[in-house]
């Protein structure tokens, strides 16, 4: 659980997945907390841009083919992070993206802050936690009846270093959490 919202969970996920000074493939439309992690860990971002939906004037999803191309061109990338669903509700093909990312032996981190509700109806898209992502971050307060700042970091595979994540969650969260939020 995170009582410092998805921000602390994103900081911890990135910090635990990429060595200081390392490279990470990052969707350009990611949350500012990811940029804070890049700065704090002195990471080298490789930006991948979502396609633009001209008709709606919003960012679309990220294609698995584009992910494959970027990973082939950047073999020293240590993780891939994308946002799905986006702030506009666009969902990328997480299952196929996870297969691509895992062929390159790196973890897939999905910022699913706006998708905590996905588990609760067959009419919603499937959560990244069920589609092969290694780390999934959800903000309960964005789409569920929960207090502001409540979020979770799901560890979905052995590619996520649990001990590192625990250590960084301890660094990035308050040492005096509100029991009301927990």
Regions found by a protein language model. Name each.
Residues 1:
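Glycine-rich active-site/cofactor-binding loop and its immediate structural neighborhood
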Residues 4-182:
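Conserved PLP-enzyme active-site core in the AAT-like
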């Amino acid at each position: 659980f995170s009582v410092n919202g998805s921000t602390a969970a994103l900081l911890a996920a990135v910090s635990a997945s990429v060595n200081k000074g390392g490279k990470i493939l990052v969707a350009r439309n990611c949350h500012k907390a990811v940029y804070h992690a890049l700065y704090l860990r002195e990471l080298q971002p490789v930006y991948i841009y979502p396609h633009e939906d001209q008709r709606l004037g919003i960012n679309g999803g990220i294609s698995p083919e584009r992910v494959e191309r970027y990973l082939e061109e950047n073999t020293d990338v240590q993780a891939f992070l994308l946002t799905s669903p986006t702030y506009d509700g666009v969902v990328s093909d997480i299952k196929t993206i996870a297969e691509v990312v895992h062929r390159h032996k790196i973890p897939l981190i999905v910022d699913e802050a706006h998708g905590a509700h996905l588990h609760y109806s067959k009419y919603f898209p499937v959560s990244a936690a069920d589609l092969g992502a290694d780390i999934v971050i959800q903000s309960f307060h964005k789409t569920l009846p929960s207090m502001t700042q409540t979020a979770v970091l799901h560890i979905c595979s052995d590619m996520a270093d649990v001990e590192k994540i625990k250590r960084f969650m301890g660094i990035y969260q308050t040492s005096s959490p509100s029991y009301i939020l927990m």
